[in-house]
């Protein structure tokens, strides 16, 4: 699949490639990098913002954003951990993102959990503490209110987001092929 | 631009589908990823023809698996704490009340339901709860639908007293069949369904005629069919109550936002207020995971069996793992000498086609184009078709155009397939390709020697008991050389994918979509049926036989400008 998908090129030197094959744009804004874990072969495109600095204010090491393999964070995406007042004080909670997750341009994500193979379209707002289960599809321009739970293999859209459809049994294979394909086509010119 | 695959919907004739000029044929074509494959029948199945059963129920909000025994009692809705906002249908959150106590913020009872989408709160309808869990059971006490539920249960109980016998009297023909003659209806239903239907006790009705009915419709006693014995049902008060006592006059005087939109009310379980301020939240509907079976009456094998706990499938027989994937791309327009605007006589078209078959297009003759650009009349387009092999052994493909039926409507294009026979290499693990990437001569093609292990096969896509389709074919190196000599124009091979050319000539008077079907026949080596069906041997034994499978794809290459 993807036999005719074109190469996606970037100017040489504008992306940093890590030992594990992550490709991170020099123009991405990554704060608190020590609190961010990338699984490998994931792409963070230019203008994306990852707020690893918004950590829980207690002693010790805290993972703020963890991301699996073959993820693609498009241009202008903002990922920040959700926070709320708990027992009288404001606390941030970590964001967990699975393998093969694609987030479209300019989407803002404050989810608590994004399962494997989830596809979020462009210009979405994913509210605080949203849980998106495996292999869900969030259509472009969807707004998911705070604490929405998206069950696996479903399609959501609209504002506020509603469950619109479910996906075929082959969706996992399709998503994995797509994400791995995109990674291999994303190269320096 | 689309490539759709044909499902014969259990038609066993293995005839090609009607061409796209028959609109009815469109219902047999769907994308490859939504099709199933039954190994027992060796056939493609689709969502329209598979037999579907519910495997499990779950709540889409709390994701709790609801035992199927409870589903009916719970009326297909989550019976925990999941409610949808009456205004925007977002799942409601449980919010505690916060208050200051000794300079400390304390949160606790009473709890209310709030919507994070539109800020609706259950306080507006007076719903508050003592506990943060089991909202549904707490609500059962004050649920205003209760009266209607009781009424329904009562009328059901009333009717159920007649549902004892499934052995109604034989039908007697009569010109006057009372519409309320339920045993008669039961019998008709049983006849139509070829099985017993638990019906109303006809025996009780024998020879008895309800006095009221008889006196009202007179003369009925003479009819052969008679009323069932059905005592009067006395309605409770439910129909009188309810808060929807507003008249149409009152409604018409109100502003629009005050009146609840129909879209917010039609999913309600019970007749409820037409005032938007008093529409009540409903429990969230349960979702299902489905088991799918082969629809063939003598087969009924499982094609899909979900796992209640995960997104994996215990059984997943999908066409994606059996049929080569066909994709179309890289469109080029052939630069022809003559202008395409003047209509050509049929002989002329024939002539040009023959010419084209003889002379091969030289490089520089063609110009790349965007795939979604409108097609021009009289132009010739050369596409690439990509075939990706999902099997662990090479396959040989024969690509043809099916013959249209005699009186088929005229077509707006001609299709020419320069390379009708070609091979597609086996699917391998990714690392195995890396070494061959540069190499056009994939060792896999030479390879009768390469036999995949059992594990390698069964782990793919979680498929169980997938039969090996071991193929050695005519793909020895000599066979390959032979093919080279014959000259496969424009054939590109990479890993388990082969790209071939496809020429489409848009006729001068063409309009609308250019759509056509292709017949794909592929040959693979299949195991001879193993004595133990559960465990097909993967060894390429002398019992292996060459098998062919034919399917049809429908290509839409765009619209004529
Ligand atoms: Zn079908
Ligand atoms: Zn079958
Ligand atoms: Zn629930
Ligand atoms: Zn709402």
Label each PLM-derived region with a short phrase:
Chain A
Residues 26, 32, 40, 46, ...:
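Residues on the solvent-exposed faces and adjacent turns
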Residues 1-35, 39-41, 49:
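Extended, small-residue-rich solenoid/repeat segments and analogous flexible loops
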Residues 36, 47-50, 54-56, 65, ...:
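Extracellular beta-helix/beta-solenoid repeat scaffolds
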Residues 6, 12-15, 58-62, 69, ...:
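Glycine-rich hexapeptide-repeat left-handed beta-helix
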Residues 22, 41-44, 68-69, 73, ...:
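Well-ordered beta-strand segments characteristic of repetitive beta-sheet solenoids
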Residues 98-101:
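Gram-negative (and chloroplast) outer-membrane scaffold detector with strong preference
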